[in-house]
Design a protein with these regions (language model features):
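Short, low-complexity disordered leader/linker segments with a strong preference
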Residues: 1-30, 56, 83, 105-112, ...
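Extracytoplasmic "Venus flytrap"
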Residues: 30-53, 57, 62-79, 85-87, ...
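Short, solvent-exposed amphipathic alpha-helices that sit
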Residues: 42-56, 138-142, 166-186, 201, ...
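Short beta-strand elements in bilobed, periplasmic/extracellular small-molecule ligand-binding domains
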Residues: 56-68, 155-158, 180-197
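Hydrophobic alpha-helical
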Residues: 92-108, 175, 191, 195-257
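Flexible loop/hinge segments that line or gate small-molecule binding clefts
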Residues: 98-137, 145-148, 155, 161, ...
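Hinge/cleft segment of the Venus flytrap/periplasmic-binding protein
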Residues: 163-167, 178-180, 281-334
Length: 334
């Protein structure tokens, strides 16, 4: 009799526990987006795309974070915290491709998927790298815009982000190679400086270029922070119409500079799409629908699919050109 009572109590408890479990909502999948630095308009737009992907994936929470100033040390500290929080994936634009490898490996060993986008982590530190575009196309576009602005002849300079930024260094390498071609023989690259993607430092570096090179005709800034700073510097030095700025910028931040004449045209991919695609890809790795191996196909939701190359990298597409004819339209979007 005693045994029967114990058995009945156990069954009753099992029913209660079971019914409680049925009512419990499944835990949300957490994808952390770690950007180069907070307060950067490009990454704010990428965050919008990440949230869109989260809604489509379903039951996904996006944790948007990054250091206040762009540094590998700041990102390492953040990733350590995310590992402790046991997030499901980290989507990151890296401030240094190699310095982040050990902490990224630690995350992957804990079962966290790592997808780098925009500026990549070295292959051993992530499942996938999503490039916004093809490096050759990006470099070529910026040289072409600068050449058109100055009539194919004159001195130009480059204002980049940090000296360790993977993407900018690759693009600059492409630009330097292109400048060796006969069609650009009359264009001379006189300096490459770094503003570390900080507005004040980028502005100071741009002022330095303008004052050190009185014959300068154009500044190429392959960074959304740098192009704004350089445009302001040209205006403040009363050089609009004498020195032109081009590079990669956000329409919402560049519309005024296009209207002022400091910028004839600039280019950028859609950061909303980039953030969306990177987050959607992370979701595929979390659920096992994508494999981190060369030749694997990864779904990017509304943007279709991409195939990973030998380094497990893929690209979205060519950058788009913005000028006085279309900048206002796109400024309303990002």
């Amino acid at each position: 009799m005693k045994i029967q009572k114990v058995w009945l109590i156990a069954v009753a408890l099992g029913i209660l526990v079971g019914s409680g479990g049925c009512q419990r909502k499944p835990e949300k999948t957490r994808i952390a987006m770690v950007v180069k630095n907070l307060g950067n308009g490009f990454f704010n737009a990428a965050h919008i795309g990440a949230d869109e992907a989260a809604k489509q994936l379903g039951n996904v929470e996006v944790i948007y974070t990054g250091p206040t100033t762009p540094s590998a040390e700041g990102q390492i500290e953040i990733i350590n915290s995310l590992i402790s929080q046991k997030v499901d994936a980290i989507v990151i634009s890296a401030n240094d491709p190699n310095a982040l490898v050990p902490i990224a490996k630690k995350a992957m060993l804990r079962g966290i998927k790592v997808v780098s986008f925009d500026s990549g982590i070295a292959p051993e530190g992530r499942q996938m790298q999503l490039n916004p575009s093809n490096a050759e196309l990006i470099g070529e576009k910026q040289i072409q815009m600068a050449a058109d602005a100055i009539g194919g002849a004159g001195e130009i300079a480059i204002l980049s982000a940090s000296a360790q930024a993977t993407n900018q260094n690759i693009w600059i390498g492409v630009m330097k190679t292109l400048l060796e071609k006969p069609e650009y023989a009359k264009i001379k690259l006189v300096a490459t400086v770094y503003g570390d993607d900080q507005s004040d430092k980028s502005y100071r570096e741009a002022i330095g270029l303008l004052r050190s090179h009185p014959e300068l005709k154009a500044i190429i800034a392959p960074t959304t922070v740098g192009i704004v700073a350089a445009s302001k510097a040209v205006a403040d030095e009363h050089l609009v119409g004498k020195v032109y700025v081009t590079g990669l910028g956000l329409p919402s931040e560049m519309a005024g500079h296009v209207k002022s004449g400091a910028v004839k045209e600039f280019a950028i991919w859609n950061p909303i799409d980039l953030g969306y695609a990177a987050t959607y890809a992370a979701g595929q790795f979390i659920t096992g629908r994508a494999e981190a191996k060369p030749g694997a196909t990864v779904s990017l939701g509304r943007l279709g699919t991409v195939t990973l190359d030998a380094n497990r990298e893929a690209a979205l597409g060519a950058p788009y050109t913005y000028n006085a004819n279309n900048v206002d339209k796109f400024a309303k979007l990002f």
